[in-house]
Amino acid sequence: MSDIGTLSAKGRDRAGKGAARATRREGQVPAVIYGGRQDPVLLSLAPRLIHTEMRKAGFSSRLFDLTVEGGETHRVMVQDVQFHPVTDMPIHVDFLRIGKDTEVTVAIPVHFINETASPGLKRGGVLNVVRHEIEVHGRPDALPDFFEVDLTGAEVGDSIHVGVVKIPEGVRPVIAERDFTICTIAAPSGLKSEEAAAGEAAAAAATPAA
């Protein structure tokens, strides 16, 4: 996993939609820390801090030490970010408090590597991504920023399943009962046409003359 990030915030006194709107009018993003069998902590964050962290890999699976001005520091993960429907700006952030026994469920992005080492792609095959993310459950400190799928040697018609993905100890796929598909190498349209024509020719040759 990546290094633990740091965030700073100010506390706020009031909850509710009216208080959240007032926080936004002040140019801040309302937020809350909850979980860990403790009372929620109401916060306001500078928008630039959220934007900076969202541009980094593994934002949704990363641990943060969030320090409240004049208060304590909380170990947290981002649980949810709400966005404005028009501007797409963050308008509220939920943080989950992380304890020593906390486990979380998150979707981790999949990165594909060594595409140039795939004979199927070199022949014009198409990488058909079935899952852009893998939903996993586990300890926050064991979560990777992303999973890698190596396409070395992949031929047209091959399917790559979750069983070949390197998953850290302490992390497990939410779908555990089957080896689900991550991607396939599909035949290019030209090759499909050639194979179809060849199949039709073979069928015609095998048909007895009337």
Swiss-Prot record:
Belongs to the bacterial ribosomal protein bL25 family. CTC subfamily. It comes from Rhodospirillum rubrum (strain ATCC 11170 / ATH 1.1.1 / DSM 467 / LMG 4362 / NCIMB 8255 / S1). GO terms for molecular function: 5S rRNA binding; structural constituent of ribosome. Part of the 50S ribosomal subunit; part of the 5S rRNA/L5/L18/L25 subcomplex. Contacts the 5S rRNA. Binds to the 5S rRNA independently of L5 and L18. Residues 1-23 are annotated as: Disordered. Keywords: Ribonucleoprotein, Ribosomal protein, RNA-binding, rRNA-binding. The keyword Transmembrane helix does not apply. This is one of the proteins that binds to the 5S RNA in the ribosome where it forms part of the central protuberance. CDD domains: Ribosomal_L25_TL5_CTC. This is Large ribosomal subunit protein bL25. GO terms for cellular component: cytosolic large ribosomal subunit. GO terms for biological process: translation.
